[in-house]
Amino acid sequence: AICACCKVLNSNEKASCFSNKTFKGLGNAGGLPWKCNSVDMKHFVSVTSYVNENNYIRLKWKRDKYIKENNVKVNTDGIPSIDKLQNIVVMGKTSWESIPSKFKPLENRINIILSRTLKKENLAKEYSNVIIIKSVDELFPILKCIKYYKCFIIGGASVYKEFLDRNLIKKIYFTRINNAYT
């Protein structure tokens, strides 16, 4: 399952709950437009870190079936070996850069950065398990060869938009901040 970080009941509602105003309000100058809400951050960590070992086999079977039906080619070059069952978080370069250094990479999650310009050698050595991809299409072969529980798309706006436009998001976790920020 690819999830974005309000459960949406049908695919028509997915697109309608995110308008152009929503995408303009997701970030501000590489950060959040509002002060950090510790309750929301704890919820984000909880949702994106939670793994149910007992449910993994069922999810893996569904994924393998999808990948086989869609004839996805798998190349494991440059993909780190990960033994512990974790979730994947996919983010754009600006979202990655907005994370304070002390929290990078996001703990207990497989971090994947979607960027056309960022290169692996530009990352600090302590980020050796971070995966960099240039396009959404590069994500699918990685999903085939990594042991993971769920894949979360965590931003920014253009990354959300691309996954939504391609109808790749199954579930949306949505926090509404009822205020205007400039």
UniProtKB/Swiss-Prot annotation:
<comment type="function">
    <text>Bifunctional enzyme. Involved in de novo dTMP biosynthesis. Key enzyme in folate metabolism. Catalyzes an essential reaction for de novo glycine and purine synthesis, DNA precursor synthesis, and for the conversion of dUMP to dTMP.</text>
</comment>
<keyword id="KW-0560">Oxidoreductase</keyword>
<dbReference type="InterPro" id="IPR017925">
    <property type="entry name" value="DHFR_CS"/>
</dbReference>
<feature type="binding site">
    <location>
        <position position="40"/>
    </location>
    <ligand>
        <name>substrate</name>
    </ligand>
</feature>
<keyword id="KW-0808">Transferase</keyword>
<dbReference type="GO" id="GO:0046452">
    <property type="term" value="P:dihydrofolate metabolic process"/>
</dbReference>
<comment type="pathway">
    <text>Cofactor biosynthesis; tetrahydrofolate biosynthesis; 5,6,7,8-tetrahydrofolate from 7,8-dihydrofolate: step 1/1.</text>
</comment>
<dbReference type="GO" id="GO:0032259">
    <property type="term" value="P:methylation"/>
</dbReference>
<comment type="subunit">
    <text>Homodimer.</text>
</comment>
<dbReference type="GO" id="GO:0006730">
    <property type="term" value="P:one-carbon metabolic process"/>
</dbReference>
<dbReference type="Pfam" id="PF00186">
    <property type="entry name" value="DHFR_1"/>
</dbReference>
<feature type="binding site">
    <location>
        <position position="160"/>
    </location>
    <ligand>
        <name>substrate</name>
    </ligand>
</feature>
<feature type="domain" description="DHFR">
    <location>
        <begin position="1"/>
        <end position="182"/>
    </location>
</feature>
<dbReference type="GO" id="GO:0046654">
    <property type="term" value="P:tetrahydrofolate biosynthetic process"/>
</dbReference>
<dbReference type="GO" id="GO:0004146">
    <property type="term" value="F:dihydrofolate reductase activity"/>
</dbReference>
<protein>
    <recommendedName>
        <fullName>Bifunctional dihydrofolate reductase-thymidylate synthase</fullName>
        <ecNumber>1.5.1.3</ecNumber>
        <ecNumber>2.1.1.45</ecNumber>
    </recommendedName>
</protein>
<keyword id="KW-0554">One-carbon metabolism</keyword>
<keyword id="KW-0489">Methyltransferase</keyword>
<dbReference type="InterPro" id="IPR012259">
    <property type="entry name" value="DHFR"/>
</dbReference>
<dbReference type="GO" id="GO:0046655">
    <property type="term" value="P:folic acid metabolic process"/>
</dbReference>
<comment type="similarity">
    <text>In the N-terminal section; belongs to the dihydrofolate reductase family.</text>
</comment>
<dbReference type="GO" id="GO:0005739">
    <property type="term" value="C:mitochondrion"/>
</dbReference>
<dbReference type="GO" id="GO:0050661">
    <property type="term" value="F:NADP binding"/>
</dbReference>
<keyword id="KW-0511">Multifunctional enzyme</keyword>
<dbReference type="GO" id="GO:0004799">
    <property type="term" value="F:thymidylate synthase activity"/>
</dbReference>
<dbReference type="GO" id="GO:0009165">
    <property type="term" value="P:nucleotide biosynthetic process"/>
</dbReference>
<feature type="binding site">
    <location>
        <position position="175"/>
    </location>
    <ligand>
        <name>substrate</name>
    </ligand>
</feature>
<feature type="binding site">
    <location>
        <begin position="93"/>
        <end position="95"/>
    </location>
    <ligand>
        <name>NADP(+)</name>
    </ligand>
</feature>
<keyword id="KW-0521">NADP</keyword>
<dbReference type="InterPro" id="IPR001796">
    <property type="entry name" value="DHFR_dom"/>
</dbReference>
<comment type="similarity">
    <text>In the C-terminal section; belongs to the thymidylate synthase family.</text>
</comment>
<feature type="binding site">
    <location>
        <begin position="114"/>
        <end position="117"/>
    </location>
    <ligand>
        <name>NADP(+)</name>
    </ligand>
</feature>
<feature type="binding site">
    <location>
        <position position="154"/>
    </location>
    <ligand>
        <name>substrate</name>
    </ligand>
</feature>
<keyword id="KW-0545">Nucleotide biosynthesis</keyword>
<dbReference type="InterPro" id="IPR024072">
    <property type="entry name" value="DHFR-like_dom_sf"/>
</dbReference>
<feature type="binding site">
    <location>
        <begin position="25"/>
        <end position="31"/>
    </location>
    <ligand>
        <name>NADP(+)</name>
    </ligand>
</feature>
<feature type="binding site">
    <location>
        <begin position="155"/>
        <end position="162"/>
    </location>
    <ligand>
        <name>NADP(+)</name>
    </ligand>
</feature>
